[in-house]
């Protein structure tokens, strides 16, 4: 039994979707899964690097001072790099997950979707129906006159 037949059997809407739509959703899923794998890898790397830098004193050493061979600069660089990788991978996972959920594949689609979600078309219609103030009307009429070639007619 094929995947499409299984979807039709349980009456999923995806069964009647086009192949292009299915490919698009698979691509979005793959991006999310890849960023999830990168996040898991980065978290594991951060854990290992933290454990490797851990200082465990011997029996009669004090635990309030690091050994003299300890390099604070290297430790800071590793911490900043690890934090940056973790932040980037988690951010990419959030972004790709949101785009997969909203069915967005390009920046242009994201702009359209946000405009729709935030009521951009209705607000644009309301703005177009509002009356102009006197100064704006004078400027608009002047520009229309210039475009129509009436700039020589001085009244």
Swiss-Prot record:
<keyword id="KW-1133">Transmembrane helix</keyword>
<feature type="transmembrane region" description="Helical">
    <location>
        <begin position="76"/>
        <end position="98"/>
    </location>
</feature>
<feature type="transmembrane region" description="Helical">
    <location>
        <begin position="30"/>
        <end position="47"/>
    </location>
</feature>
<dbReference type="InterPro" id="IPR038814">
    <property type="entry name" value="AIM11"/>
</dbReference>
<dbReference type="GO" id="GO:0005739">
    <property type="term" value="C:mitochondrion"/>
</dbReference>
<keyword id="KW-0812">Transmembrane</keyword>
<dbReference type="GO" id="GO:0016020">
    <property type="term" value="C:membrane"/>
</dbReference>
<protein>
    <recommendedName>
        <fullName>Altered inheritance of mitochondria protein 11</fullName>
    </recommendedName>
</protein>
<comment type="similarity">
    <text>Belongs to the AIM11 family.</text>
</comment>
<keyword id="KW-0472">Membrane</keyword>
